C-alpha cells in the first residue's frame, strides 16, 4: 500500500483547498502522516474550507496549523518543529481573472510564500518538494498539445507569471542547493469539493438558481478538463519519484523539460480537450435543466484552448488521466446536490 514500504511525514500546504484536501486524504488513507497548513482566506467561502478540514481532521495522523505562507517566522517554526519526508506545496492565491483585478495579493502567497517553502526545504534537508504549477504558464502558446519541452515565456496573466516564477525559483534552488523539486502543471481541475470560482461550480449554482451563465469567447473555447481523482493519482505517484540531474542535458540546446539539476516539470491533464459548449450540455443533462446563456467576448488573461501533452508523466510513473467529463460531471453534480441539499 505504501510505496517504499514506510509511512512518511508530509507537509501539505493549502490543505483546506480543493486539491490539498484530496491529497491529504489520499496520504492519510494510505497510512502516512500529514501536517497541513492553510490561511483559510476569504477568496471563496471559508465554510467550505472548514468542512473539508473537518473531513481530513477526523484522522489522528493529521495536524493542522492556520498559517499564512508569507509569515516567515511561522513557516520557519513549521520546518524546525518537524522532519518532513516530502513537501507537497499546493497553497497559492488562485484565479487568472482575479489576478487582473487584484495583482498585489499574488505577491505574498505565490512569490514570498514560495520562497519561504524553498528556504524551509533548503535548511531542513527535505528530500523532495512537489509543487503546483499551472497550465496557465503556456500563455500565448498555440502549438498543441502543450509540452513541457516547449518554452513558456509569454504569460498573459499575472497568475501565470507567478507560476512561471515558481518554476524558475525551484530550478534555481535545485541547481544551487541540490534540492529535488518537481513542478506539476495542472489542467482545469474539477470534481467534488471543487472551488466555487471555477466554471463547473459557478455554472451549476447559476443553473439551479435559475440565473444565466456567462460564456466567454461566445462559446468557442476548449479546455483539457481533468478530474480531481486523476490529479491526485498523478501527485501521489510523482511524490515518490525523486528527480535526479540529467547528465545528457545540453546547455547549447537547452530542453525546458529536463535539467542538469534535480528539477523536473510534468503536465497533469487528460490530453482530450473538450469544447465548452459540450461541457455545458453534459452539465445540463446531469442537472436535468437547461441553462440560460450570456454569450460574451474573450476576457483579458484568458486563452482559447488548452491541451496537455502528458507523455512525460506517463513515461515517468505509468499513469495518465482518463476520467471522461460525462462521468466526472455526474459525480460532481451528485456531490453538489448532497452537500448543498438541492
Model feature map: region roles:
Residues 49, 71, 199-200, 231:
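Amphipathic coiled-coil/heptad-repeat helices and related helical stalk/stem segments
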Residues 1-189, 239, 319, 331, ...:
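N-terminal Rossmann-like NAD(P)+-binding domain of SDR-like oxidoreductases, especially those catalyzing
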Residues 193:
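Conserved GTPase G-domain signal focused on the G5
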Residues 165, 169, 173, 203, ...:
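Hydrophobic alpha-helix immediately C-terminal to the catalytic Tyr-X-X-X-Lys motif of short-chain
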